[in-house]
């Protein structure tokens, strides 16, 4: 689900280039889309806005503001949508700022997911992690594996 048509097309192109099969729909999370059967997916992937409303740096343009700051898409709304779309045992993968992990884990638990893997990314060895990659399983048992920190140089 992608709100911006240009970003949705980029997602489709990335799927094609990587030989992957997937469905990318342009629209709002709260809608009902016949092309997205409930419980029909093995994997849902999300790159939610990094910051709650009225926080974070001011974006230089409307497209970046939409991508960076929550509006209709909140972490909880993303988890609720993934819970409806994924089959039992299906995975939900997403990236977000590390300071939002507690909020994410609460939303995952409330929507029937168990976080299974976590990896933090650092821009350099001297700086704090600025991105968290999380994989959760719908209906999964407790047990989180924390992978080694990855340093992006």
Describe these PLM feature segments:
Residues 11-12:
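Conserved SAM-binding loop
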Residues 34-44:
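A short acidic, Gly/Pro-enriched loop at the edge of an enzyme's catalytic core
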Residues 1:
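The conserved SAM/SAH-binding core of class I Rossmann-like methyltransferase domains
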Residues 19-34:
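Conserved SAM-binding strand-loop segment of SAM-dependent methyltransferases
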Residues 4-6:
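Conserved SAM/SAH-binding beta-strand->alpha-helix loop
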Residues 125-153:
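Flexible, glycine-/basic-rich loop-and-beta segments that form/coincide
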Residues 43, 48-77:
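Mobile active-site "lid"/loop adjacent to the S-adenosyl-L-methionine
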Residues 71-133:
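Conserved Class I SAM-dependent methyltransferase catalytic core
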């Amino acid at each position: 689900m992608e709100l911006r048509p240009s970003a949705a097309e980029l997602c489709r192109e990335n799927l094609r280039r990587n030989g992957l099969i997937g469905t990318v729909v342009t629209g709002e999370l709260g809608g009902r889309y016949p092309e997205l059967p409930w419980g029909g997916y093995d994997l849902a992937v999300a790159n939610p806005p990094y910051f709650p409303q009225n926080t974070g740096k001011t974006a230089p343009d409307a497209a970046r503001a939409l991508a960076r700051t929550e509006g209709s898409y909140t972490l909880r709304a993303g988890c609720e949508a993934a819970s409806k779309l994924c089959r039992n045992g299906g995975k939900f993968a997403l990236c977000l700022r590390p300071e939002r992990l507690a909020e994410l884990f609460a939303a995952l638990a409330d929507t029937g997911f168990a976080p299974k893997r976590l990896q933090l990314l650092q821009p350099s060895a001297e700086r704090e992690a600025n991105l968290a990659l999380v994989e959760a399983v719908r209906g999964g048992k407790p047990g989180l594996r924390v992978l080694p920190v990855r340093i992006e140089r």
